[in-house]
Amino acid sequence: MGCDRNCGLIAGAVIGAVLAVFGGILMPVGDLLIQKTIKKQVVLEEGTIAFKNWVKTGTEVYRQFWIFDVQNPQEVMMNSSNIQVKQRGPYTYRVRFLAKENVTQDAEDNTVSFLQPNGAIFEPSLSVGTEADNFTVLNLAVAAASHIYQNQFVQMILNSLINKSKSSMFQVRTLRELLWGYRDPFLSLVPYPVTTTVGLFYPYNNTADGVYKVFNGKDNISKVAIIDTYKGKRNLSYWESHCDMINGTDAASFPPFVEKSQVLQFFSSDICRSIYAVFESDVNLKGIPVYRFVLPSKAFASPVENPDNYCFCTEKIISKNCTSYGVLDISKCKEGRPVYISLPHFLYASPDVSEPIDGLNPNEEEHRTYLDIEPITGFTLQFAKRLQVNLLVKPSEKIQVLKNLKRNYIVPILWLNETGTIGDEKANMFRSQVTGKINLLGLIEMILLSVGVVMFVAFMISYCACRSKTIK
């Protein structure tokens, strides 16, 4: 009887030990299995989960616009007063709804090339008004022409054309005209061939961004989605040194197994440069654990604070000898037009930039850019890309409508918020196919290990207790 009991206790301890060992072995084996499956599914080729969602995003993406309506145009033009602006919006468009075009795999270098077509559909139900709403904004053509043509004789000719067309420093335009283009009366009088249509995003519809050529990950999963070339080049030709490099992905996805310590680099054609994001916090997105990465203020710092940014400073006067920060002069990629990009309401910008503008209220929560990334797959499941479009206008002795200005202005025209969030159906699929299976495997591992250890310890204690009684 004693033997049977002892044998049973030993058998229980052995079973517990086996379960614990099996649970322990399952951990690395399970991790390897997960890695193998993920690596297979994030490759950008026909038949994978990644490819299907990459060719045409299943997420609805919206671009909201807030326009800075100028309240005191005459005071500014006559007295060089601070510009008083009133934010109006949002005006919402659906974007990025078109599938990638000319998708071509290259087996030799394991890349895939494509064009990203552009399209925008106005969403009245998500907007405060219509595309016919009027705004008082800086005259884009007058500001640009006076900057591009600085020869005084040429500016005298420009002045006569500006006066003849009855143009001024400011203008009234509809939302549709401001965004997508209008025929400018001043440019229409220029006696030599110039583009007479002006708009902040002209041309947009029926155009495409690219060609992009990205690594498909077949030979090296750590390079998947990373851009090899953009428009056939590895550099942009806008900046000096490392600032001109095309780094990272397009931010729609990143190589799998993202770590919190990583600096995620990505390229944005909207701002004509590569930029980066750093980990901020863990976020639960519809039951899916994601990492929130944000653009840090350091990315917009002056070279004085962040020496890596020295090559983004391209002139000395407006930047106050490269000490100003928070705005990026992208005129080189806008055919010389004095376009400056910043975060909305000049968030993270130096006081000298925003000082001439009244009515701004920078708010980090509302105006910063972030990416919510599922770390195992590297997929961006939610994002908010926020930026502001500004135009530089300077005094001019020869152009009457700019003659009374006593300082330079970086004038905010609008800011945009482009957002996308994984839909409920896609989130359910993602939970069942990815995070659910991983969590289930982890649960099984812990149960086997825990039960095994408890059984082994309990049966061994019982066995020792029984032996002690038997000896007595």
From Swiss-Prot:
This chain is glycosylated at 79, 102, 134, 163, 205, 220, 235, 247, 321, 417
Q: Which UniProt keywords apply?
A: Cell adhesion, Cell membrane, Disease variant, Disulfide bond, Glycoprotein, Golgi apparatus, Isopeptide bond, Lipid transport, Lipoprotein, Membrane, Palmitate, Receptor, Transmembrane, Transmembrane helix, Transport, Ubl conjugation
Region of interest (Interaction with PTK2, PXN and LYN), ranges: 460-472
- Which Pfam family is an annotated match for this chain, by its short name? CD36
Q: Which GO terms describe its biological process?
A: amyloid fibril formation; amyloid-beta clearance by cellular catabolic process; apoptotic cell clearance; blood coagulation; cell adhesion; cell surface receptor signaling pathway; cellular response to amyloid-beta; cellular response to diacyl bacterial lipopeptide
**Main site of residence?**
membrane
Renumbered to this chain, the positions carrying a covalent lipid of the kind S-palmitoyl cysteine are 3, 7, 464, 466
Q: At the top level of its lineage, which domain of life is listed?
A: Eukaryota
Q: Where in the cell is it found?
A: Cell membrane; Membrane raft; Golgi apparatus; Apical cell membrane
Q: Which reaction does it catalyse?
A: butanoate(out) = butanoate(in); (9Z)-octadecenoate(out) = (9Z)-octadecenoate(in); (9Z,12Z)-octadecadienoate(out) = (9Z,12Z)-octadecadienoate(in); tetradecanoate(out) = tetradecanoate(in)
Q: Where is this region: Required for interaction with thrombospondins, THBS1 and THBS2?
A: 93-120
As annotated, the protein's associated disorder is: Platelet glycoprotein IV deficiency: A disorder characterized by macrothrombocytopenia without notable hemostatic problems and bleeding tendency. Platelet glycoprotein IV deficiency can be divided into 2 subgroups. The type I phenotype is characterized by platelets and monocytes/macrophages exhibiting complete CD36 deficiency. The type II phenotype lacks the surface expression of CD36 in platelets, but expression in monocytes/macrophages is near normal. Coronary heart disease 7: A multifactorial disease characterized by an imbalance between myocardial functional requirements and the capacity of the coronary vessels to supply sufficient blood flow. Decreased capacity of the coronary vessels is often associated with thickening and loss of elasticity of the coronary arteries.
Q: How does it assemble?
A: Interacts with THBS1 and THBS2; the interactions mediate the THBS antiangiogenic activity. Upon interaction with a ligand, such as oxidized low-density lipoprotein (oxLDL) or amyloid-beta 42, rapidly forms a complex with TLR4 and TLR6; the complex is internalized and triggers an inflammatory signal. Through its C-terminus, interacts with PTK2, PXN and LYN, but not with SRC. LYN kinase activity is required for facilitating TLR4:TLR6 heterodimerization and signal initiation. Upon interaction with ligands such as diacylated lipopeptides, interacts with the TLR2:TLR6 heterodimer.
Its function, per the record, reads: Multifunctional glycoprotein that acts as a receptor for a broad range of ligands. Ligands can be of proteinaceous nature like thrombospondin, fibronectin, collagen or amyloid-beta as well as of lipidic nature such as oxidized low-density lipoprotein (oxLDL), anionic phospholipids, long-chain fatty acids and bacterial diacylated lipopeptides. They are generally multivalent and can therefore engage multiple receptors simultaneously, the resulting formation of CD36 clusters initiates signal transduction and internalization of receptor-ligand complexes.
Name used for this protein in its record = Platelet glycoprotein 4
Q: Which organism is it from?
A: Homo sapiens (Human)
